[in-house]
From Swiss-Prot:
The name this protein goes by in its record: Cytochrome c biogenesis protein CcsA
GO terms of molecular function: heme binding
Membrane-traversing stretches: 9-29, 48-68, 71-91, 98-118, 143-163, 225-245, 258-275, 286-306
Main location, first listed in the record: plastid
Family of this protein: Belongs to the CcmF/CycK/Ccl1/NrfE/CcsA family.
Keywords: Chloroplast, Cytochrome c-type biogenesis, Membrane, Plastid, Thylakoid, Transmembrane, Transmembrane helix
Compartments, record wording: Plastid, Chloroplast thylakoid membrane
Entry's Gene Ontology cellular component terms: chloroplast thylakoid membrane; plasma membrane
Record's function text: Required during biogenesis of c-type cytochromes (cytochrome c6 and cytochrome f) at the step of heme attachment.
Lineage: Eukaryota, Viridiplantae, Streptophyta, Embryophyta, Tracheophyta
GO biological process: cytochrome complex assembly
Alphabetized HAMAP family for the sequence: CytC_CcsA
């Protein structure tokens, strides 16, 4: 009873803190002058990390097994994984763009886990015999960590696509006006008008330079995180195959979860391969990673809606 109450308290505290962090972070985006807001949001994410960690440990002690046996517990672990990814660069004193991805992802997964859809899973139950194995921690934790890293990397690629497309649309729509008005020095009659045009052109060039730097950094961070997530995913699939052979006598059974895990692995293997091809631009690679964002959610969450296959123990009903 004590552990159940503590788990309930930690769940709501972590959700409340991350909600405040999101609010602070949105304010800091619009008000750059307030330096303390960024530090406050980072401290809030640290507090969220410890709350979710305490929640997982409490549920582990209360249930007697590692908390990864159903969708609710895996969502909590996914939320914890997002907070870990957020904090690693922070402790290394590297300010990056991950916070724009990890903080909303944490509140989304934490909010859904505590929603009414998964109320039946909030109470810990005895795990099915197939899950009573030491491979549970190895396999599922690696898969969830892989999903978290791949989702973050994919969202960075989506951001790269949005910035690039906005730039292309802006250049296309203003190309004629820019050429006619900014560079038609014949029509400029006074020196001060020419000076204004040069200042405007210089400002545009400076803005384009910083946009190019932003795109490059997003591309680099996306590649690094996806590479890490791909490693976790590979370890998770291999450990799952060994576990399946022990439990069911076969390394691979092509049930829906395994099939979509293989599709996910293949897609990001293609992404990493395209990164080695110098003829492929970052925009094209980002398209592949963006498709991977949808594939991951189908693999992790969409397949659970079917409620069939060897992984049906992680499914839930919408009624």
């Amino acid at each position: 009873m004590i552990f159940s109450t503590l788990e309930h308290i930690l769940t709501h505290i972590s959700f409340s803190i991350i909600s405040i962090v999101i609010t602070i972070f949105l304010i800091s985006l619009s008000v750059d002058e307030i330096v303390g807001l960024y530090d406050s949001s980072e401290k809030g994410m640290t507090a969220t990390f410890f709350c979710i960690t305490g929640l997982l440990v409490t549920r582990w002690i209360y249930s007697g097994h590692f908390p990864l046996s159903d969708l609710y517990e895996s969502l909590i672990f996914l939320s914890w994984s997002f907070s870990v990814i957020h904090m690693v660069p922070y402790f290394k004193k590297h300010k990056n763009y991950l916070s724009t991805i990890t903080a909303p992802s944490t509140i989304f997964t934490q909010g859904f886990a505590t929603s009414g859809l998964l109320t039946e899973m909030h109470q810990s139950e005895i795990v099915v015999p197939a899950l009573q194995s030491q491979w549970l921690m190895m396999h599922v934790s690696m898969m969830i960590l892989g999903y978290a890293a791949l989702l973050c990397g994919s969202l960075l690629s989506v951001a790269l696509l949005v910035i690039t497309l906005r730039k292309a649309i802006r250049v296309f729509s203003k190309k004629n006006n820019f050429l006619n008005e900014s560079f038609s020095f014949v029509e400029i009659q006074y020196m001060n008008e020419r000076s204004n045009v040069l200042l405007t052109t210089s400002f545009c060039s400076s803005r384009n330079y910083y946009r190019a730097q932003l795109i490059q950094q997003l591309d680099q961070w996306s590649y690094r995180i996806i590479s890490l997530g791909f490693l976790f995913l590979t370890i998770g699939i291999l450990s799952g195959a060994v576990w399946a052979n022990e439990a069911w006598g076969s390394y691979w059974n092509w049930d829906p979860k395994e099939t979509w895990a293989f599709i996910t692995w293949t897609l990001f293997a293609i992404y990493l391969h395209t990164r080695t091809n110098k003829n492929w631009e970052s925009f094209n690679c980002a398209i592949v990673a963006s498709i991977g964002f949808l594939i991951i959610w189908i693999c992790y969450f969409g397949v659970n809606l079917l409620g069939i296959g060897l992984h049906s123990y992680g499914s839930f009903n919408l009624h």
